[in-house]
């Protein structure tokens, strides 16, 4: 597959950087790490080497959503087949001096807006440990870190990670949450539709209709 094929396939739905972020994460969520290096190569040819850290960070950020094993396999596939154009540095090193718990809480509240407390109470009623891990780790240390991938790009990445898993309750919140982080309705629906098509290509069977705006 060439970058022209990818761009023709999803012609005009998203700008190239966002398209490639959504694509690698959707394939990773579908457990198709074999697709990752080809897309990363296309992205570097079309956008330039600067997209490589974004693709790597998008996959890192997807880890609490799709699971560490799939993320590890996808990143290994990418880095093994495409030598990183820049040294791999610990991007979150500066977080040692930041209250990531507070940062995660702010990010969580911006994502869910007026339904923040309802979402939090729902998680807490299921498991206090789960709620704290979600806020402190997933949101605090991972999703709210914006030095490489922006909040808007993170929101599109989350949609791409959730669609293949057929988890409408979570997808519903993040479709709306993406709007709160600056995405347009068209961008949100494009990320959803691209991830949905990739899921079908990978043989994912859905129980019913996938959530929409």
Curated annotation (Swiss-Prot):
It is found in: Peroxisome matrix; Cytoplasm, Cytosol; Nucleus. Keywords: Cytoplasm, Nucleus, Peroxisome. GO terms for cellular component: cytosol; mitochondrion; nucleus; peroxisomal matrix. A motif (Peroxisomal target signal 1 (PTS1)) lies at residues 211-213. Signal peptide: none annotated. Coiled coil: none annotated. One of its GO terms (molecular function) is peroxiredoxin activity. This is Peroxisomal protein 2. It comes from Schizosaccharomyces pombe (strain 972 / ATCC 24843) (Fission yeast). The lineage of its organism: Eukaryota, Fungi, Dikarya, Ascomycota, Taphrinomycotina.
